[in-house]
Amino acid sequence: MLSILKKLFGTANDRTVKKLFSEITKINSLEPAIQKLSDEELKNKTVEFKEKLKNGATLDDIVYEAFAVVREAARRVCGMRHFDVQLIGGLILHRGMITEMRTGEGKTLVATLPAYLNALTGKGVHVVTVNDYLASRDSASMGKIYNFLGLSVGCIVGGMPDEIKRAAYNADITHATNNELGFDYLRDNMKYSLQERVLRPFNFAIIDEVDSILIDEARTPLVISGPVNDNSELYGKIDKIVRLLNASDFEKDEKLKTINLTETGITHIESLLSKENIIKPDTGLYDFENLTLVHYVNQALRAHNMFTVNVDYLVREGKVMIIDEFTGRVMEGRRYSEGLHQALEAKENVKIQNENQTLASITFQNYFRNYPKLSGMTGTAMTEAPELKDIYNLDVVAVPTHNKVTRLDLDDEIYGSKKEKYDAILKLIKDCYDRGQPILVGTISIEKSEELSSVLNKEKIPHKVLNAKFHEQEAFIIAQAGRFKAVTIATNMAGRGTDIMLGGNPEMLIEQLDKEHNYEAKIAEIKAQIAEEKKQVIEAGGLFVIGTERHESRRIDNQLRGRSGRQGDPGKTKFFLSLDDDLMRIFASDRISGVLRTLGLKDGEAIHHPMISRSLEKAQQKVEGHNYEMRKNLLRFDDVMNDQRKIIYEQRTEIIKSKDSHGFLNSTTEELAKKIVLTFMPVGSYREDWDIENLSVELHRVFSIKFDHNVVSKNDVTEEEITKTVIQMAHDIYKSKEEAYSSELMHNAVKYILLTTLDQVWKDHLYSLDHLRQGISLRAYAQKDPLSEYKREAFNLFEQMLNNLKELFIQTVYHFHIDLKHVQKEDVSLEYKKLQQNMRESREDPAFSKYNAGSSLETDLKPVVSRIDPKDRNPDDPTSWGRVSRNELCPCGSGKKYKYCHGAHE
């Protein structure tokens, strides 16, 4: 019944597209008039649009004309005219939705339409891509259109200094990777002045390969971290012990990706730990004094039994590097958290890095929800439409192709074993290679791609391998995968974002030419060669895409299929499966095995049947549903931290903006003074119960007050009067500091101390939340909801953090001291600038710019500063140097800067 109604009235997607096509006629009707404009007149349209917006017009009022202007600019500058379906894609993006467009339909060009329109507001547009190569490529190619129309373009890639980043973010349109955007957001909220920040307020983002970023990477938080205690020796010892365990000592669930010791395993490991003197002979692993070891044992078990080298990670240059399970790329700078990375390093016998403590973190889910307007584009999103709507409130609209898809998707073939499957794949590759048909073979891991590569090497079939080990060459290799007789093995969707053109990609070949020798002649030669090869490839049947396994997600399979049949080109796709494949073995083996027994599977024979395809699809849907629930659950927990993060970041910004820091100082002074007095002199208590001795000690510890016991000696004195006296004494201490150091210095110092103290307690709070999060699931055994428990305890920890902030801040302010022995009063206001400079330099350390900062960002909260005339310094006596700026030449006479000489270890 439902299918009949769909045929009669069309789907909701069909109706949306039909409505959008009616709007395209308005853009097309403007084209003749726009084409008559001179280059200068076309460029002036940008000024005209901005003026209209200033006078109250909305973006929707100018959308059709703006799109017509961009289309004409693209035609003149790049020789590319937007098709009607591309205009539809642009309207979808402008309206804050996701557009699904097939591979090769020109998504990069589509983004220019909403990017230009929304940049006219002057608030900036972020075009987000998955890697530095695509960000650089798109900003260079599409930037010509924006520049022609008078807009500025910026590009953000890893390793850029802040000055260049700031300029790029201030451009009208900025191309950047999702990683750099997220980390810059975290770094900005660790800086000490608004001028040091690089990002502008959030406005509008267009995410390319939106499914990869918002779905595949949603469970991977961005983390800036610093080292904690060195436990590398313990990881090494536990690793050796775990290697001695038997298969019966633990149970693992590959579906849930969990592993636990059995009763015999616990007994076995306790005896091994006891022999190594790691635990006492009369104690058990789960005794209170040994509980911390459980964490190390569990991570070692996971490292050895749940993670495989060249599948989940690879070892390069003595380092364990994570492989992205969806793209096959190495995730540079990323480390597993909670000690898992250290366990893998112990397993692979490489240097064990220190565990890291989180200093700042955010998930992509919460980062991208900061944008008031968000949109995205991809070739595959409809299968994830419910999740994108539920979590990000983004609707998905599938746009029809410009040319009809002529690609033929063949039925899957299933074999009893991996060897039989590889034999069948090899036979097909040989057949295609002999007639010159290009082949792209998709694998799910580096290990599988290298297995297949070795098979092809034995058969002497020339081929290229594209996986995480050859990341730098991936765009070039994938671009040439459509050439005559080309055989390319690719890990999943490595090279995504680069089109495979039949006959080859001329632009990339031209880029490699030597421009000094016969450049024009060589260009003509390349173009002629590619045109000839394209004819040969089309005659051979176009690109043949072979899948060596089904992925857990149907979307990833669809992406692989979408590599073939670009813009109406011919092509074929086929998946080869075996009962040994992970998806079949873990999720579908029983159901499929029953079907195969019914159909009668024999050695060396393949079965292809619609029933198998349906069973596989159900298995994939089951996994997708499980992964969706995991992402949703992660978001529920991360939302708790996100609410707290927003409060802290907003407060931090307010502190930086504030011109008067005394308000918080005075209110906190009064609050703490009252709290301390009431602690030692409770309301309604007798005088003889007052603890004056400890009151004096506490007031000195917090406020540096020397409390006079005589104040309490009066018979009629009350707690309220003593509180007022204490507050006045604290104010007097502060005033004396202002007189000694100047009010400007004290204002800046108070702000500086408040920020550094806030950073310190927030860092400690994140550490506490990490530990709380790790163990909270165990509350379910006590019939308690882990999420509710986490919310309650996280709130209590947050309140505790705020109390710690107040006390640490007040204590530091009132104990703050500058040695004036060698400092002129008129120079003292410069001392704060030196403190700020030192703070800035500590954050300019190269390690800080990495995803996992290698240096702790803890700040010295006892800034004692003195300056000495350089003439009075004895080069041989460092004690006579006083305070030396880190960028000054070292007083020892070495000729080096102080920070690289005697100051290197400060």
Swiss-Prot record:
Subcellular location: Cell inner membrane; Cytoplasm
Keywords assigned: ATP-binding, Cell inner membrane, Cell membrane, Cytoplasm, Membrane, Metal-binding, Nucleotide-binding, Protein transport, Translocase, Translocation, Transport, Zinc
Cofactor annotation remark: May bind 1 zinc ion per subunit.
Pfam families per UniProt: P-loop_SecA, SEC-C, SecA_DEAD, SecA_PP_bind, SecA_SW
Topological type in the membrane: Peripheral membrane protein
SUPFAM superfamilies: Helical scaffold and wing domains of SecA (SSF81886), P-loop containing nucleoside triphosphate hydrolases (SSF52540), Pre-protein crosslinking domain of SecA (SSF81767)
EC assignment: 7.4.2.8
InterPro entries hit by this protein: Helicase_ATP-bd, P-loop_NTPase, SEC_C_motif, SecA, SecA_CS, SecA_DEAD, SecA_motor_DEAD, SecA_preprotein_X-link_dom
GO biological process, one term: intracellular protein transmembrane transport
GO cellular component: cell envelope Sec protein transport complex; cytosol; plasma membrane
Names of required cofactors: Zn(2+)
Residues noted as binding Zn(2+) in the record, renumbered to the chain: 890, 892, 901-902
Chain spans, region Disordered: 862-885
PROSITE patterns: SECA, SECA_MOTOR_DEAD
Residues where ATP binds: 86, 104-108, 499
GO molecular function, one term: protein-exporting ATPase activity
Enzyme class: translocase
Top-level division of the source organism's lineage: Bacteria
Catalyzed reactions per annotation: ATP + H2O + cellular proteinSide 1 = ADP + phosphate + cellular proteinSide 2
Primary residence: membrane
Subunit: Monomer and homodimer. Part of the essential Sec protein translocation apparatus which comprises SecA, SecYEG and auxiliary proteins SecDF-YajC and YidC.
Membership in a protein family: Belongs to the SecA family.
Functional description taken from the UniProt entry: Part of the Sec protein translocase complex. Interacts with the SecYEG preprotein conducting channel. Has a central role in coupling the hydrolysis of ATP to the transfer of proteins into and across the cell membrane, serving both as a receptor for the preprotein-SecB complex and as an ATP-driven molecular motor driving the stepwise translocation of polypeptide chains across the membrane.
The protein's name: Protein translocase subunit SecA
Lineage: Bacteria, Pseudomonadati, Pseudomonadota, Alphaproteobacteria, Rickettsiales
Gene that produces this protein: secA
